[in-house]
Amino acid sequence: MALGKKVLQKPPLSLANELHKDTGKMPYFLLQARHIANTLITGWHRQRKSGNGENFWQFRPYMEGESITRIDWRRSARDENTYLREHEWQTTQTVWLCPDQSASMHYCSRFSKISKGNHAIILTLTLASLLARSGEHIAIPNLMSPTMTSNVVERIAFALENHSDENSFPDFSTITRFSHVIIMSDFLDYPEKIIQHLTVLTTKQVTAHLIEISDPAEESFPYTGHTEFLDPETKEKHVSTKAEDLRKSYCKLYHARRQELVNFCARQGWSYHVSTTDQPLTETIFHLANTMSDSPLHKRRAL
């Protein structure tokens, strides 16, 4: 579902096709993703912290008393510190990337320069670039099986460019057990319906990371006066002559929906993070780096 605009400039059918048409900008999205990934890698290298791109989340400092056979001498030679390769990351993992491309994701208010869908695509390509340098298998449900190739980012871009899906979520039944699953969506639906879609993942012993893509207008509901609201997926319309009167109730329901999803994720040992389209993607990527390295799946694999 998308929020309102003062005047509806395009018919519903054109709204539904907007996000798919934006994929013509895929070369620009690839360029942006590479720039973000390279900036992060350069920053990690400059700070001399473990996880500098080639070994994303893979190393930690050596502690006295630990076996020297686990020291990674190549990584340690880069600076004055000594690093161990984490045992759990010696086994390649599969990370499933799930960017929502449904009609509501095309929404972009005047408070942002990019739609939710394009924000999700750039995030997907950036994560793929970083994960590929880590040697992880990367996959997209219904589009690309787990793979680890040098051109995986380009393959993902091509797959997304030639794919249009009205559904917010893919077929999760194809996801392999003991994987990481990163789901990028606006999650604008009844929470119980979303949870029903996600239930299949709870049986697969995966660790899911839900990234809620949000437009600034969806957070604050800045609308006033006569406003028409359109749901681009159901085509349902609502006209308000005094939109500001809806703000309090809207914000209450909007944040209650989010909190219910946060609580569900917490019970599963999953993570939930909000990524607004007017903010840099780096914060979201740092969040994923921390939560994936601290996840129960990560710790179980160390046993």
Predicted regions and their residues:
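Exposed, interaction-prone extracellular/peripheral surfaces
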Residues: 2-48, 56, 61-69, 75, ...
